[in-house]
Structures are given as C-alpha cells and as structure tokens.
Regions:
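N-terminal cap/lid segment of alpha/beta-hydrolase-fold proteins
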Residues: 4, 8-91
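Short beta-strand element of the alpha/beta-hydrolase
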Residues: 91-103
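Loop/turn elements at helix/coil->beta-strand transitions in domains of secreted/extracellular proteins
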Residues: 92-95, 124-128, 173-175
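Alpha/beta-hydrolase active-site loop signature
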Residues: 103, 135-137
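Serine-hydrolase catalytic-loop signature spanning alpha/beta hydrolases and amidase-signature enzymes
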Residues: 103-106, 128, 161
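Short amphipathic alpha-helix adjacent to the substrate-entry channel of hydrolases
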Residues: 110-130
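Alpha/beta-hydrolase active-site loop
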Residues: 145-167
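Primarily recognizes the serine-hydrolase "nucleophile elbow" in alpha/beta-hydrolase
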Residues: 160-190
Length: 190
C-alpha cells in the first residue's frame, strides 16, 4: 500500500541556452503591425469537409445540413492563414501553429479567437499560423478514431509545408511551437 508512504523524487530542470533576443521588447510586447496571408494551400486530401465556423453552432443543423457529405469523401484543399510581423528585420523567427477545436466536427482556422491569438503573437515577432484540417466522421468508434488520426496527419503536413517554405516566411526551424484548443490540442500533442 503506497498511499501512506512518502516517495522521494528529484526533479532535474531542463536547461537550454537562453532564447536570444535581438531587442528587449521582442516576444514580450506588441511591437509589430501584422500582415495576414489567407487561404494558403498546404495539401490536397480526401475527406468529408474542412470548415464549419463554430461561432454560431447548432449541432442538429450541422448534422442535418451535412449528412450527404457522409456518403462519399471528396478531394479537399487544406488551407492555412499565415500571420507575419511587418517590417521585421530578423531572417529567422520562431513559428507558432494553432489548430482549432470543435470535436473534429466543426471549427475554422479564421474564427475570432484564432485570429486574435495569431495577430497577438505575430505582433510580438513570431510567425503565426492557423490551419484547417479534415473534419467529420461516420457515427462509429473506428471512424471517430480515424478522424483524429487524419487531423494529426494534416497538422504534420502543414508543418512540413512550413518547414519547406522556411526561407520564404523566415522561419527558425529550431523554434517550432504547436498548440490548439479541444480537438486542436489533442492534435497538437500528436
């Protein structure tokens, strides 16, 4: 019975060279205006759908209006919005990629919270990206699991695309960060 025993342990802090700042406000304060590039295609895939903005969701209507989409997958263009700090002189900047939530069923890269997050981080000096990914699933456990796996594949494809375009967007590939909400956070952890 371990419930009454004290278990000593030691934490070893992860030590990394300090993040080098070119000026004292970068990454701390909003110092840049932001350029937004919308609907950058990063892949083509087969799936049910990509985007149902979740700011006015009525799940019953989503199911009713999209049930024909469950019959057959179609080719979809995976897109992302890219937010860049304007007039930034650094040749390499850290990247933050956000993945929206919505239970792998609804959501969109351009909903207000993701626009605000991306604008904020780009104004600090990061390259920031919000992606769309395949959504929708037939009502069975295997299909739901497959949808989560496909979202992960799509996020990996987005990151591969960004790394391949690192010179264009001036991305520091040693500093790549991924986050999300709900289904997006599940995807980000994979």
């Amino acid at each position: 019975n371990l419930s009454n025993k004290k278990m000593p342990f030691l934490l070893y802090p992860y030590i990394e060279d300090e993040f080098q700042l070119s000026d004292t406000n970068r990454y701390k304060k909003e110092v840049f205006e932001v350029e937004r590039i919308t609907d950058v295609n990063y892949a083509k895939v087969d799936g049910f759908w990509l985007s149902i903005p979740d700011d006015t969701i009525d799940i019953a209507n989503v199911v009713k209006n999209n049930w024909f989409n469950y019959l057959k997958k179609k080719e979809l263009n995976l897109d992302m919005d890219i937010y860049l700090p304007k007039n930034d002189t650094l040749t390499q900047r850290p990247l933050m990629m956000f993945i929206h939530g919505g239970a792998f069923f609804v959501g969109d890269k351009a909903t207000v919270p993701y626009q605000k997050w991306c604008n904020h981080f780009a104004s600090l000096g990061y390259v920031c990206v919000s992606i769309n990914y395949r959504m929708g699933f037939r009502p069975n456990q295997k299909a739901i699991e497959r949808t989560a796996y496909q979202a992960t594949q799509d996020a990996h494809a987005a990151m591969r695309y960004l790394v391949s375009k690192q010179d264009i967007y001036r991305i520091d590939t040693d500093n790549l960060f991924v986050g999300g909400a709900s289904a997006g956070s599940i995807t980000a952890m994979n």
